[in-house]
Regions:
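Glycine-rich ATP phosphate-binding loop
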Residues: 73-93
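Conserved N-lobe beta3->alphaC-helix segment of eukaryotic protein kinase catalytic domains
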Residues: 90-113
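A short, aromatic-enriched beta-strand patch in the conserved N-lobe beta-sheet
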Residues: 123-124
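Conserved short submotifs of the Hanks-type protein kinase catalytic core
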Residues: 129-141
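Activation segment signature within eukaryotic-like protein kinase domains
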Residues: 164-165
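Catalytic-loop of the protein kinase fold
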Residues: 176-193
C-alpha cells in the first residue's frame, strides 16, 4: 500500500532549498577519521498536518522485504507511534568508494527532489552500521506488475500506458532540467506503481550530474540491456546526454506494453548484447492491432538510433500521443487494484 499517512510533507526548509547545478559527487575523502555518514543520526523529523513528528530507527517494525540489489535491501516498515508506513533502503557502507558515491548520489538526489513523479524522501538515519534512507512506499515495481498482468491473460491498455509514459517522462524531465541529472538506469524495475494509480521513478544511485552543455562518459553505470547505442559504441568515445534516458524509456515501454523484452537476453555474452543494440534495427511495437498508430510512433521516436534524431525527455512530452490522450478518462486505479487483488488471491 502507499504510505498510510498520505499527507506527509517534506520539511519546509527542504522545499525552499535552492537547487544546485554545481553539486559534485566525487570520491569521499580518504581521511579515516571522518566518514561521509558520521553526521547521520538515529532519528529524523518531518512535518505533517502542521505537526513535526520524530521517527526513531529503533521504533521501526519491518513488515516485509520489497527488494534486494547490489547496494543493499529495501524493506517495508511501519512506525507505530505515527502510524506511518515507509520504504527503507538499508545499506551497509563499505570502503568501496564507488558504492559510497552511489549511496550519496541516491540520497542527495532524493533530498533535492520536489517532484510528484519521483518517490518522496522522508529522511535518513544511521543504525547499527547501516544507512537507512526512508522513502514513500509504493505497491509494486512495473517489472513485476506487467508480469502479473500478462500472467492473468490481460493486456496493458493505452490509458494505463499513457499514465506510465507521462509520469516517467515528467520525472526524467525534472531530473534533467531542474537537477541537471541523468538517471542512467531507467528500466521497469525502477518504475513504481501504487493502488492510487500513481507511477513514480526511483533509484538514483548511479545518476550522473550533467553540467550545462556537458556530456557524460561512464559506460558501466546502469543495466546494459537498456543502454542507448551511444553509451556502448566505442566510436563515440562513450559520450552521451539526457537522450540516453529517452532510449532506455523506449525499451522499457516496449517491454511493459508487450510483456516481453525486445532483445534476446545473452546473460553472459557481453559481445552479443552490444552487437544487438549497435547493429540491429531499433526495436518497435508490433503492428498487430493491439496498439494505436500514435502510440507506436511515440515509442518509435524514443528509439531513434541516431542520437541527434532522438528527443530529450521534455521534448518527448510534447508528442501527439501524450497530448491527445491527456483528457481521456483512465481506468488505471481500477485496473491496478484488480490485478493486485487477483495476484494476492493467488
Amino acid at each position: 500500500m502507499p504510505s498510510n499517512n498520505e499527507n506527509l510533507t517534506l520539511p519546509e526548509d527542504k522545499k525552499k532549498r535552492k537547487k544546485s547545478e554545481n553539486l559534485y559527487i566525487g570520491t569521499p575523502p580518504s581521511n579515516p577519521t571522518k566518514s561521509p555518514f558520521d553526521d547521520f543520526r538515529t532519528s529524523f523529523e518531518f512535518k505533517t498536518e502542521g505537526q513535526t513528528l520524530r521517527i526513531v530507527a529503533d521504533d521501526l517494525t519491518t513488515i516485509c522485504e520489497l527488494g534486494r540489489g547490489a547496494f543493499g535491501v529495501v524493506e517495508k516498515v511501519h512506525h507505530p507511534e505515527t502510524n506511518t508506513t515507509m520504504a527503507v533502503k538499508r545499506i551497509t557502507p563499505t570502503q568501496d568508494s564507488i558504492k559510497t558515491e552511489s549511496l550519496l548520489m541516491d540520497l542527495r538526489t532524493l533530498e533535492r527532489s520536489d517532484c510528484p513523479f519521483i518517490v518522496r524522501f522522508y529522511g535518513v538515519m544511521f543504525r547499527q552500521g547501516d544507512v537507512m534512507i526512508c522513502m514513500e512506499v509504493m505497491d509494486i515495481s512495473l517489472d513485476k506488475f506487467y508480469k502479473c498482468v500478462f500472467s492473468a491473460n490481460r493486456l496493458m491498455s493505452e490509458d494505463v500506458l499513457w499514465t506510465i509514459s507521462f509520469s516517467v517522462l515528467n520525472a526524467l524531465a525534472y531530473l534533467n532540467k531542474e537537477l541537471r541529472v541523468i538517471h542512467r538506469d531507467v528500466k521497469p524495475s525502477n518504475m513504481l506503481i501504487g493502488r492510487n494509480g500513481k507511477v513514480k521513478l526511483c533509484d538514483f544511485g548511479i545518476s550522473g550530474i550533467l553540467r550545462p552543455g556537458s556530456v557524460a562518459h561512464t559506460v558501466d553505470a546502469g543495466c546494459r540491456y537498456y543502454m542507448a547505442p551511444e553509451r556502448i559504441d566505442p566510436t563515440t568515445n562513450k559520450r552521451y546526454d539526457q537522450k540516453s534516458d529517452t532510449w532506455s524509456f523506449g525499451i522499457s515501454m516496449i517491454e511493459i506494453s508487450t510483456g516481453s523484452f525486445p532483445y534476446e537476453r545473452h546473460l553472459k555474452d557481453l559481445f552479443k548484447q552490444q552487437k544487438q543494440i549497435l547493429h540491429q534495427d531499433a526495436p518497435s511495437l508490433p503492428d498487430d492491432g493491439r496498439f494505436s498508430l500514435t502510440y507506436r510512433q511515440f515509442v518509435q521516436r524514443a528509439l531513434k538510433k541516431k542520437v541527434e534524431d532522438r528527443p530529450k525527455p521534455y521534448q518527448l512530452l510534447e508528442d501527439t500521443f501524450l497530448k491527445e490522450q491527456r483528457h481521456c478518462e483512465s481506468n488505471i486505479v481500477r485496473f491496478v487494484n484488480d490485478i493486485l487483488d487477483n495476484t494476492s488471491a493467488d
